[in-house]
């Protein structure tokens, strides 16, 4: 592999990552908020996928959120310690972030005190998508070109 091409691709992706991080900060105030949100979303990815696909109107955030929430078993959720382990964020910060998301109904606690998705989970979904779209589009383009070059070698 040509070292110059690798470095050029790496630096180009790093530049896009900086832009993506700025966009994430605009939407979520900081990366920790975003990581906690992603951690809970990743835990519920099956229910989110099924809920979005099963929703009669994907553009209706409330209807889609209800479709997702209906698919989450009552006993399923993530503990604060699980989020701390997954994200590497200090427990006090995770607790503060979760409390803020609980007030906004982005998250809710189930009967066992586990964190799960709330009715307003999709409230800033469009901003998240806009903030991430350019970054993932650029990374895909750059890594495809790099992968093609590697396969030719």
Question: Which residues are covered by each model-predicted region?
Answer:
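Short amphipathic alpha-helical interaction segments
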Residues: 88-103
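Amphipathic alpha-helical interface surfaces
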Residues: 32, 76-79, 93-97
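Short helix->loop/beta-hairpin flanking segments within DNA-binding domains
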Residues: 35-76
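A short alpha-helical element within helix-turn-helix/winged-helix DNA-binding domains
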Residues: 69-70, 75-85, 101
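N-terminal leader segment of winged-helix/HTH proteins
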Residues: 1-38, 42
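Charged/polar positions within long, soluble alpha-helices
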Residues: 22, 99, 103-106, 141-148
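Amphipathic alpha-helical dimerization/coiled-coil segments
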Residues: 131-153
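Short, cationic-aromatic polyanion-contact patches
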Residues: 61-66, 79, 106, 111-136
